Each structure stands twice: as C-alpha cells, then as structure tokens.
Curated annotation (Swiss-Prot):
InterPro entries, alphabetized: Tankyrase-bd_C, TNKS1BP1-like
Name the UniProt record assigns to this protein: Uncharacterized protein KIAA1671
Pfam families for this protein: Tankyrase_bdg_C
Keyword annotations from UniProtKB, A to Z: Phosphoprotein
Organism: Mus musculus (Mouse)
Stretches the record annotates as Disordered: 43-289
PTM-bearing positions, type Phosphoserine: S62, S166, S205, S259, S262, S288
Residue ranges with Basic and acidic residues bias: 91-109, 175-186, 193-216
Residue stretches of biased makeup (Polar residues): 43-55, 80-90, 136-152
Segments of skewed composition (Basic residues): 153-168
C-alpha cells in the first residue's frame, strides 16, 4: 500500500477494505451467551407443537431481537438461509447509514493528514517552529577579558633564570639605602590594577627621582677596620714606620733564610719559589762549602733587585 502515489485513490481503497473487515468480523447484536438463553422461559420462543398449531410458522408470535437467534437454531435448513439473508440485509441497511456518516468524518480527517505536506501547514504549528530559534537573538557576546588577564598572568609567572650574586648584592644595598616611603610605594604595586593604562608623563616623572637618589649607592660607606681606634692616630703611626724602615733599606741587605717566603712573586713572570723548610736550610749551611753559600746569596740578591 505504500507504493501508491495517488492519495485519494489510496484513501478510497482503505475505506472499502475497512468496510469489508467490519462486515465479516462483526458479531451479530442479537447473539447472546448460552447461560442467559437457558435462564429465559421457553414460552417466549414457542415449541414445535405450538408452531404446528399456529399454521406452520416457525418463528415466534412477537418478533423480538432476542428471540431471533433461537429461532434460527430451531428452523429447518431450507428456511434457515432465507431468514439469515433477510436479517443480514436489514442489518446492513441500518449499519450502512451509520458507516456513511462516520466514513465522511474519517475521510475528511485522512485527507487532512495525507495532504498535510502538499498543502499549507496548520496555523498552530508555524509559531512553535519560529519560537524554537528565538534563543539565538537573546545570546550576548562572550566576555574574553578574564581569559586575556589569565594569559598575561601566566606569562608573568613563568620560571625565570636565577639571579646572579652581583645583582643580589646590588638589590640588597639598594633596599638598605631606600627610605621607608619608597618601600611603601614599591609595595603598593600588588594592589594596583595592571589593566589600567598609565600616562607616559607620570612614568618619566616617577623614574627621575629614584635615579638621583640611587647615585650615592655606587659608593657605599666604608666600615672602619679597627672600630675602637681613631683613624687619625693610625695615619700618624704609618709615616713613623716608613721612616724606621727606610735606613734599613739603604744598608746592605742581609738574607734571612729562616723567614718564610711567599710561593708566588707577581713581579717575576712565571717564577715560582717554594718556601724552604728550616731544617733543610740548617743542614745545608752545615754541609755546604763557602763558595756555595756565596752563590746562593747572590741569586737571592738578584731576585729581590728584580722585584724592586
């Protein structure tokens, strides 16, 4: 049935098929259960003797719908067919009227259902379909400012290389030299909004005063080596020592083998002398001859002259 392309013909065939089904499958309204028939009196239906007395009529005196089924069972086979055809013809006439009225209603409803896609859609469906897409106009543009700030913060919080010791010392000295007011101004950066645009004039004016204040940082205050001593007294004692040492330098220099010597002399390039042990020097002086001692003393004198 799905392969027909004419909807009106399809409806007509369906209507005829339904009528045929109802004709063959409908139960007779006069038929009743056997229990109810047994309870009823036999006088209503009559007996075989009564029927012979009445002139051979095989039906009851008062035709009623309830007694028709019993009379059909008692009639002979010849009259059974005639009575059945008469009853079915009457029933079909009555039922055909009801079916026509109901079929008109059904056909009109089926025409509306089958011709739905060809004809215009009903008025109730159109506004529902339009309202389905109304949420598109209500949506607002997404605010991506929060995502931008997250990206900026993640860039700032990336791991940096460790600061060298020289930078740490300079920062430490700068923090010591700063005044408490400057520290407060530097600490308030955490409470400022980084998204606010700063004017370039303010940045220049803010950068200039710290430059002037940071100039003395390059020359830190020198701590005294001897805190208990007066520096003026120490300076007065230094020239006295130089005067005492100067006459000794003018005299012939005498070697002092027991004094320890420095392992490296910066004046002589590439010359390194190990400090001789005192025990070896004493043994060498006792065992070595006079000419060897003079030779060693000359070498020492030449080394010190080159250094001077």
């Amino acid at each position: 049935m799905d392969y027909y392309y004419c909807p009106s013909l399809l409806k007509l065939l369906r209507y005829l098929w339904n009528q045929l089904k109802q004709c063959f499958s409908r139960r007779a309204p006069e038929a009743k259960d056997t229990d109810t028939l047994v309870q009823e009196a036999d006088s209503q239906y009559g007996t075989w003797a009564d029927q012979h007395q009445n002139g051979g009529s095989f039906g009851p005196e008062s035709p009623s719908p309830d007694s028709s089924a019993a009379s059909v069972g008692k009639q002979p086979p010849g009259s059974h067919l005639s009575s059945y055809t008469e009853s079915t013809s009457v029933e079909q006439r009555d039922s055909s009227r009801d079916r026509r009225s109901s079929s008109v209603d059904r056909s009109s409803s089926e025409l509306e259902s089958t011709d739905g896609p060809e004809g215009p859609p009903p008025s109730d469906v159109c506004p529902a379909q339009e309202d389905d897409f109304s949420f598109i106009h209500q949506t607002s543009v997404l605010d991506s400012s929060a995502l931008k700030t997250r990206v900026q913060l993640s860039k700032r919080s990336r791991r940096r290389a460790p600061i060298s010791h020289s930078l740490r010392r300079s920062q430490f000295s700068e923090s010591e030299s700063r005044s408490p007011l400057e520290e407060e101004s530097h600490s308030t950066w955490m409470f400022k909004d980084s998204t606010e645009e700063k004017s370039p004039r303010r940045d220049e004016s803010d950068e200039e005063p710290p430059r002037v204040e940071r100039t003395p940082v390059s020359h830190p205050q020198r701590m005294p080596v001897f805190p208990g001593m007066d520096p003026a007294v120490l300076k007065a004692q230094l020239p006295k020592r130089s005067e005492v040492d100067s006459p000794g330098d003018s005299l012939s220099w005498t070697p002092q083998p027991k004094s320890p010597k420095s392992p490296f002399h910066p004046g002589v390039l590439g010359s390194r002398v190990l400090p001789p042990s005192t025990e070896k020097e004493e043994r060498s002086e006792e065992c070595s001859p006079q000419w060897l001692k003079e030779l060693k003393s000359k070498k020492r004198q030449s080394l010190y002259e080159n250094q001077a």
